[in-house]
């Protein structure tokens, strides 16, 4: 962002905050980096998150969602008001889940994973008590979107024998075509949750939320390439925390999750490869600090392992398992060799 535009944007945020809260802003920091939409405003006795998005409609949608959800759960930030295009929300904490979980042993990591899954089920349950199902957009509701999701398998063409002929693309698209009956936050990567001073985990950034199957939120979490929990262990967590009131039989729910997560994994892998060619590999610390794409060979291998495991759980996606395995092995070799994918 150009310096002039950045200072103009910051002035708008600070002016709106001082008008709304009737007190001076002492300092402004950028928890996700200065290029992001949200900033932490420091007042004399509190911190507040201010959000100014390029699309003001998403800001107003997010405020609307938070107000509805907060009526029935404490797993999301409190919306503190909207002034023009700027939304203010409670600061849910500086310990982002993606960084917090990397600091603990496997036992504590599993506890955090269980809480992350439980909180998602809770805010989805809260949404069912509201009128959000009548108000929210239906996500991925057209054939073009579903086809685009499945097209991600082209990323596997370079690994192993590529996409085998026995893969039934039509069956995959049919399985992924879902009526929007459940509220989803959408981007539930672990960098979009934080733990506050009260030790409570809360999710934030609801600007892309809408209606779909519901399992997509868990696909974003498990399919976060920087997420350190194995796919096998995450299935155990899903079974343990499953909400029987979500409207689905658990077996059907996990089958849909497996199919969806297979293609979600190819989309994440495609993003990683594109970024690696432009920027080279990044450090794992940078990825976690700025909630960046997992542009590191270890993270690339992780998302391939997620695709390998979940593709094997459904007969629709089982033909892709070998290619995921080959891709995983390829990135493990790159990690050993220290090889770059950056274009000359």
Report residues per predicted region.
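Juxta-kinase regulatory segment immediately upstream of eukaryotic protein kinase catalytic domains
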Residues: 1-28
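Short Pro/Gly-enriched beta-strand edge/turn motifs at strand-loop
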Residues: 18-25, 61, 168-178
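Active-site acidic catalytic loop and adjacent metal/ATP-binding pocket
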Residues: 29-43, 170-216
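ATP-binding pocket architecture of kinase catalytic cores
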Residues: 36, 40-132
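A cross-family kinase active-site recognition segment
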Residues: 105-160, 180-181, 210, 283-285
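All-alpha amphipathic helical-bundle segments outside canonical DNA-binding/catalytic cores
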Residues: 111, 248-260
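Active-site activation/catalytic loop segments of kinase-like enzymes and analogous catalytic loops
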Residues: 215-248, 260-283
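ATP/Mg2+ or Mg2+-diphosphate-binding catalytic cores
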Residues: 267-344
